[in-house]
Amino acid sequence: MTENNDIKMVIITGMSGAGKTVALQSFEDLGYFCVDNLPPMLLPKFIELMADSKGKMNKVALGVDLRGREFFEHLWGALDDLSERTWIIPHILFLDAKDSTLVTRYKETRRSHPLAPTGLPLKGIEIERSLLTDMKARANIVLDTSDLKPKELREKIVHLFSTETEQAFRVNVMSFGFKYGIPIDADLVFDVRFLPNPYYIPHMKPLTGLDEEVSSYVLKFNETHKFLEKLTDLITFMLPHYKREGKSQLVIAIGCTGGQHRSVTLTEYLGKHLKPEYSVHVSHRDVEKRKGH
């Protein structure tokens, strides 16, 4: 492999209950290929899979489960093998927390510690901490999550592992037709069926909001201008707060009856309004469906 095909690998390990699930979700939001609970003995095979992916797996986060002493022999061997492969850039992220915090988290979730399934969680924590001493010493980054909320842990991981491009907050604005269903991935849905409908003007019926005649018609009404003023004010207010909460993207869906005229016009307008400040993708889900409103 060449330097251009370097693979960035993060091995996530640490104390059970310290936040591995949140960490993996954070890496997934950053575009990493994530695998949870990968047994260390499978790491060499996984490395071969990455090498054969031809650049498709250039960022990988692995949640490694270390609940038995025999696992460490496989792990140390795999890590030594990684150090000899110049095309892999490995990092070990160790998540830790105070014993009292871990006990509280287990009580709150009503789960048993994996190393003390029938006993007190504190005993399992003691055993696990002893097992992971060498692993913690070998880690590139140790994060104490004792005083971190899930959102704060995500923010730390984004700060530590993302590039400037990956930190960009993405906004997807899409049009749709209610007759075909509301998009299941929409975060915000706006209904513009109250606006005058170009569909009932015969020569506009086969056109869409991408045509200037249709967009000019929809935008000429006073109610359209008032709605767009309120909509852009609302979205402009909300986006920084969504970003601060740790969301990597927001899907805004604007719907009319058939998804051809009004929603398309307003989606195009909103997308152009937001593009100077955000990374915006505009799409029209139902614009090709010519079945009428």
UniProtKB/Swiss-Prot annotation:
- Pfam families per the record? PapZ_C (PF22740), RapZ-like_N (PF03668)
Which residues are listed for ATP binding in this entry? G14, M15, S16, G17, A18, G19, K20, T21
What domain of life does the UniProt record list for this protein's source? Bacteria
Q: Which InterPro entries match?
A: P-loop_NTPase, RapZ-like, RapZ-like_N, RapZ_C
Q: Which UniProt keywords apply?
A: ATP-binding, GTP-binding, Nucleotide-binding
For molecular function, the Gene Ontology terms on record are: ATP binding; GTP binding
Ion transport keyword on record: no
Q: Where is GTP annotated to bind?
A: D65, L66, R67, G68
Q: What does this protein do?
A: Displays ATPase and GTPase activities.
PANTHER family reported in the protein's UniProt record: RNASE ADAPTER PROTEIN RAPZ (PTHR30448:SF0)
So what family is this one in?
Answer: Belongs to the RapZ-like family.
Name assigned to this protein = Nucleotide-binding protein BA_5384/GBAA_5384/BAS5004
